[in-house]
Amino acid sequence: MKSIIIASLVALAIAASPALDRTFSPKSEYVYKFDGLLLSGLPTTFSDASQTLISCRTRLQAVDDRYIHLQLIDIQYSASHIPQSEQWPKIESLEQRELSDELKELLELPFRAQIRNGLVSEIQFSSEDAEWSKNAKRSILNLFSLRKSAPVDEMSQDQKDMESDKDSLFFNVHEKTMEGDCEVAYTIVQEGGKTIYTKSVNFDKCITRPETAYGLRFGSECKECEKEGQFVQPQTVYTYTFKNEKLQESEVNSIYTLNVNGQEVVKSETRAKVTFVEESKINREIKKVSGPKEEIVYSMENEKLIEQFYKQGDKAEVNPFKAIEIEQKVEQLEEIFRQIQEHEQNTPETVHLIARAVRMFRMCTIEELKKVHTTIYTKAEKKVQLVIETTLAVAGTKNTIQHLIHHFEKKSITPLRAAELLKSVQETLYPSEHIADLLIQLAQSPLSEKYEPLRQSAWLAAGSVVRGFASKTQDLPLIRPASRQTKEKYVRVFMQHFRNADSTYEKVLALKTLGNAGIDLSVYELVQLIQDPRQPLSIRTEAVDALRLLKDVMPRKIQKVLLPVYKNRQNKPELRMAALWRMMHTIPEEPVLAHIVSQMENESNQHVAAFTYNVLRQFSKSTNPCYQQLAVRCSKVLLFTRYQPQEQMLSTYSQLPLFNSEWLSGVQFDFATIFEKNAFLPKEVQASFETVFGGNWNKYFAQVGFSQQNFEQVILKTLEKLSLYGKQSDELRSRRVQSGIQMLQEIVKKMNIRPRVQQTDSQNAHAVFYLRYKEMDYIVLPIDMETIDNVVEKYVRNGEFDIKSLLTFLTNDSKFELHRALFFYEAERRIPTTIGMPLTISGKMPTILSINGKVSIELEKLGARLVLDIVPTVATTHVTEMRFWYPVIEQGVKSLQSARLHTPLRFESTVELKKNTLEITHKFVVPENKKTTVSVHTRPVAFIRVPKNQDSEYVEAEEKTISHSQYQMSTEEIDRQYETFGLRINAQGNVLSQWTLPMVLMTEQDFEFTLENKNRPVEFTARVTIGNLEKTDLSEIKFDKIFEKEFDLENNESENRRQYFHKMIREIQSEQGFKNLITLKLEAPQQMYWNTELRTVCDKWIRMCKVEMDARRSPIEHENKEWTLRTELLAARPQMPSSLRQLREQPHREVQLALNAKWGSSKKSEITFNAQLEQSTEQKKFLRNIEREYKGIPEYELLIKAARLNQVNVVSEYKLTPESEYTFSRIFDLIKAYNFWTVSEKRVQNEDRRVVLQLSVEPLSRQYMNMTIQTPEQEVELKNVRIPRVVLPTIARRAMFQQTWEKTGATCKVDQSEVSTFDNVIYRAPLTTCYSLVAKDCSEQPRFAVLAKKINKNSEELLVKVVRREEEIVVKKSDDKFLVKVDGKKVNPTELEQYNIEILGDNLIVIRLPHGEVRFDGYTVKTNMPSVASQNQLCGLCGNNDGERDNEFMTADNYETEDVEEFHRSYLLKNEECEVEKDRISEKKNYKNKWNREEKKSDYESSSDYESNYDEKETEKELVKKTLIKEFSNRVCFSIEPVSECRRGLESEKTSNKKIRFTCMPRHSKNARRFLKEAREQTVADLVDFPVSFVESVKIPTACVAY
């Protein structure tokens, strides 16, 4: 047994011996030839590429089993542009380049390495060696680093079995290579006497990888895109060949491709190999080096020094650009700006120079920047000065920003210009603590205190910079991330700014700064603000928005914070909606969404519920690849909800996603509005634009928003101030107002009404416009009372507008010159390569914009003239680049897309009021001897730049345009010239016939469009004249042939209808008419014109109109005569009934239209339309079936529906040219094809040149349409075509007002025993002979009150009193007539209009309020108010109209109660004029909250409530009225009248038969779903307006019994 153990230990020791795994024999010298190749070009073998070949001989001395010494000798390199090949290029095919002695000495310095188990574990370099030289030597050692066998403890059993078979082996192991510590896959293959080792690197499984990334912090995390869309894809494969246990050759091939939309567009490739030359004994030892021990992984020390210099400026320990002398930097910059000045117009070359200047400025110290300022800036012209300022801001290093701030403080740069430059600083590529401190100091400086735009920009920029180093982003800097102490420091600074703020705007600015920073530790401060009810609502909402950048960092934390905020009904609706909006962008899981849906279904605030539904629905339909999981989850939870939002809800959210799933690219437009019930303006409006490009998600690429709190107060107070200027009060009106106010105050005193005081005054009212760009708040524009007061005081003096000051401001001629250089984006990623050079992949879009011009305004007595003369010039280049860098060479490939625009413009606009007309003229002028140029150029370029021996001297790169030969063959030449309007237009270039984005990036294209005017100025004029209304005679309007046989009615009523119609026309023609003339003239050079005249003649009430339009234009193309158009339209509407009786008795209820049009040049086309807008047969049947006699409010509401016109009949006769007939035929075919599944047609023989159309809309749902078209040859029928819900016209009087109230208003109904409040809460409460307060403005300055009472105890009739600030109005109905008293005096019906009172029909009177109206029919009081009214300051039986159902019962002293009786009593006006009906108001059965479901349930189940001493009453209580439902497969039918049923727990004892009318509707319709849900809880009250579908006999109980 002992012998076995000893043998095992010996075997293990032998296996672990490095001698068996070593590559080199001790005390031996090996010589290897090293060859390295850099290749930059397109991913094809058919194009040229820039190639650099580096070669040397490597002396390698194996000192012992572990250490080797190395030295490079015979170093040389060559570089040229030659065709790509899979073979190594020959040295002769490349141009020999000279290597300086200094660089050669560095490369020849020796180095030492330790090898363990075949891998290079440690490296030592000479202390004199440079970092780039060390990395070059690492690339050679990298070729000698090889693991010949898998670690025994990491081998699987299969691998151990394979180990026994020496022919092949495969294993995975983590290993350090030049490119990082990553997983490596090994394959070992025996081929004869050779052993081939192959290893490949899996970059998806790296522990560490030396790489940097800048400029990516503005993107959001898109997990769905990360799976498929890798922008840069590296591949590295090593091959080692051994023969007789000696390394014969080692080769590595790395390919780095740039992918766009899943296709490779450019590539960089590195190849390196060492080849065995000879082996010998050591004759001349390589000097041993004793530098610090380092790893084989690529060293980023040089990149780290550069980053430190950019971020820390002169405080950095090492200046990596010290080798370049200050004079040489100044000379290069001087030459750059000299060339920019020489370019009168901006060109792509100008853009290239700006990019060079930015790169050079980043290398400068403070002293060097001062030198540039004194040498170049102070002596330059204005254009160069502006460009220098912007390039310094774009450079964004600590030194350039410090230099700019220095000149801000000296005011050599104006504060407004400084604020503009700080916008570029926000996007700096190298954010740091030093830069943030500079910006905070600037924001707190005395200069910023004086200039608010500068202070705002400094704070916002500070927040954006802090995010760059203190928050988790996609950037990968080398300097360690910010510590917790650093994060806490900036949170304290920003929160101190918040706490020191006095105004709401300053607090909002502080929170936007904190939001820009996106620090995770800020969440604790923000949560406190969100949850603190003492904070103003605007602050809490802004704190929610400040969480936006933490959605990827801590999504669950945000959900945990915001979900309770959303669900808490005590919070304001806009805060809850903002919380939901922010929470949805954290991509919540399904359980969170289930909470949201549950809250939506039980939500009492309809704005919150509707907004929630819209958000979920829009996300469920999103095609944005970053929202795919969320879309699935939202779709799933919406399947189980029955909630349907009301149509009139204004709070909403919508998306327009435009994405290509294959390319992982696209854009999305979002729009959201948040309204509150008691605000006229939206609380929040957002319109945003986000992009996904190749999987890179820019969530807030651009967003414009508006938010406000109580800003209506500011507007109203401002208007009130303006209305007082120059006005004298009317004494009589003043007395009337005082009288009305006194009556309102008496009501308040008698009822002990506590005023609903506004919680926030106008000082806290404010509004904010903001612009968000790349997730950063960019601009914040506050508007508050102080701002508006300053403007009003500036232009209003002594109660009158200061016209002179305004005119002086407007008429000043203003010359301006704007030059702005900017980078729309700049991103950079640097990764190591296996040849020791860093590969930089970058994208940027430098742009220069210049605008020179003049604007002037000339004011005349009755007119004004605006002249704008500008010359905008824009040049931009999009650069995508892959670049290798060595001190000896710079090589790479880039794809360039350049665009240029230069267009001189002159625009003149004149407005002039002449004797009887208003004339508006717009003139667009193309100046003479000026050229407009639009050019686009794309090309891929390979480049090589070899510095001269003097490192500092700039050498232009050797460039060669390359292209994909296959794609290039798809291009076509364009060379076209046009002559139009006296302008010469040239379009020439070389463009792809069919293209995709990858094709554009890989081909050379150019296109130029020029517009040149060498003659006199070319003017394009548009002139509009609008004439005054003039009196005229209506007898010229003739309705001769307006009726067609298809318009005849049933039951032989046509003749009677026609006589009635012509009589009505004659009566209208006897009245005074009015006419108007509008002309439009468009004029262009070369006698091109379009002239139009529009003449209208109508009566005073627009019952009958004649519209004529004549148009003429100059002939075009093949026309030889002037083209003309003449049309005449006649229209007549029927009388507007105000009652159902009038509607039934009115013979003519249709709208008649007649149109004649004639157009053409030599040949004329003519078409005649006669149309009739009428009621369909079903709609007329609905009117006839209304058996019950309705009066008052129910009658009028039914009249609106019964008077709808849902069908149009059109008869057309035509004489068309062949061309016009073909056009109409094609349109007709398109309609049939689009509705293929619902169309049927048959061949017929009808009258020639005559078409009949009938179109009817289903009047109930208004979402289905039938259409029949009869042509001379066919009859086409479309049935049940689904359309968006339409609003049908109705001829009922005041129908438009009624429909407006239904859509946008809130309504309250009160009768003698029941109230339906503004917020749709229905409860039972009795009216007595004492006045009850129905609705009142309960603010501190009340404007109206509505009261109602019973006329006497035994009557159902009511008496209504309306108190306005001007008068008191009392209305009652006596002998079917309304008796109206104003301030105690009876008013005749003819005088009602002057008191804003109107009688509709015989049974309805309307009293207008300051904001709203009261409708009264003698039995019911209906009060209509805007849905946003009185700022939650209404009170009375109708509730507070705040959108919440839970707080409806607020008593007169502003106390919330659940006792309906207590609530009712508080609004009872007791005085000596009435006797209180104590029995009636004390009886419990008269009170009931029908909306409260739990209360209803208890009512049904409690038997004690139904006990009575009278059998009749007991039977009545045993029975309940419910809507009977009959369900069928595709429809649901409801009983129109409620049917008696036994209460729960009781069974019927006696029954009787009764005929019940039913109305049916489609099962999927919205009404069906709503009524089904409502019928389970209560009687459906809205069914009386629906048509009768069938009548059926039903057994109903008459007595119930409990068993």
Curated annotation (Swiss-Prot):
UniProt entry tagged with the keyword Glycoprotein: yes
Q: Which GO terms describe its cellular component?
A: extracellular region
- Please give the Gene Ontology molecular function terms for this protein: lipid transporter activity; nutrient reservoir activity
Where is this protein primarily located?
A: secreted
Pfam families given in the database record: Vit_open_b-sht, Vitellogenin_N, VWD
Give compartment(s): Secreted
What are the record keywords, sorted?
Disulfide bond, Glycoprotein, Secreted, Signal, Storage protein
Task: List cystine links.
Answer: C1308-C1438, C1330-C1474
SUPFAM superfamilies, sorted: Lipovitellin-phosvitin complex, beta-sheet shell regions, Lipovitellin-phosvitin complex, superhelical domain
Q: What happens when the gene is disrupted?
A: Simultaneous RNAi-mediated knockdown of vitellogenins vit-1, vit-2, vit-3, vit-4 and vit-5 increases life span, causes accumulation of neutral lipid and an increase in lgg-1 foci in the proximal intestine; however, does not affect fertility or pharyngeal pumping rates. Expression of transcription factors pha-4 and daf-16 are increased.
On whether Membrane is a keyword of this UniProt record, the answer is no
Q: Which SMART domains match?
A: DUF1943, LPD_N, VWD
Q: Output this protein's name.
A: Vitellogenin-4
Instruction: State the gene name recorded for this protein.
Output: vit-4
